[in-house]
Amino acid sequence: MSTTTAKVLPRTAAPGLAVPLLSGGTYRLADRAPEHFTMVVFFRGLHCPVCQPQLRELDRRLDELTERGIEVIAVSAETQARTRQLHDEWDLQRLEVAYGLAEEQMREWGLFVSRSVKEGEPELFNEPGLFLVRPDGTVYYESILSMPVGRPRLDDLLGGIDFWVAEDYPARGEA
């Protein structure tokens, strides 16, 4: 497997994403048609204590996102069994959660990839990333981290989204 990681630029086509859903079936980003954005949240997994509050907040505030025309999917490289475990332990009620992200997919999205350094971590997993993808399939916003901390605060992101939508603000960082 190549260790080359792509750089995903705003205003370009988002990489493909087809992953199994914990609720059944397959999530395909190309099939999504939200009013404004699809929010793709790549999270580390069950072993990550920082992922739990992020996903729980998204789950709790899903209506706020939906009202803004935003669909949300949370994705990790976890197995189905571990994803079921985190879904139950973290008490996620409505957030769509996908699992089985392959290393190649991690790299196509420009995510940092880590190897296990302690018991309880998957052998290979992605570090956090958050993308907003427009209905036309182009990347609008991205936040990619090499460590579990430093994720965008949801309140800050929602404030930005409100402004961007109201002002028809273009994606930046494309040059």
Name the predicted role of every residue range.
Residues 1-175:
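Chalcogenol-based redox active-site neighborhoods
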